[in-house]
């Protein structure tokens, strides 16, 4: 119990290592800072969409008529809820058992899955490569919100540009 109290009262602990100070809790402080409101700078939606659109692979994705009708019927608020749930369950965890294979690519399941591939929010490898958010660490709420924004913006553009 005394050790627990001692550890919980530490605000910052450093170890002197060969004359260099090493922060023993560097990753903890980074996560804590993000959880306490230190926000990551995210790329604008327009810039992200433009960059993703330059990829031959990413730009080949589009919603079919049935998926567009599903979006129109459900409304963007519901689609955004679905996207948030899918991101929370399939993209946000630090370790994903089948990372790189967890997002279906075929049409007819859900428009969010197609949008995930188009926006590189389909797996942690693509998310890291395209958006610079490292895998191996649970996504913060702001990182999850960024992914959801990318997905819903792509879907919005698909349904408005190609009604």
Q: Where are these predicted regions, by residue range?
A:
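The feature represents the first ordered module of a protein
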Residues: 50-103
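N-terminal leader/targeting peptides and immediately adjacent processing regions
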Residues: 6-14, 19-63
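Short, hydrophobic/amphipathic alpha-helical patches that form generic packing surfaces
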Residues: 3, 81-89, 125-129, 153
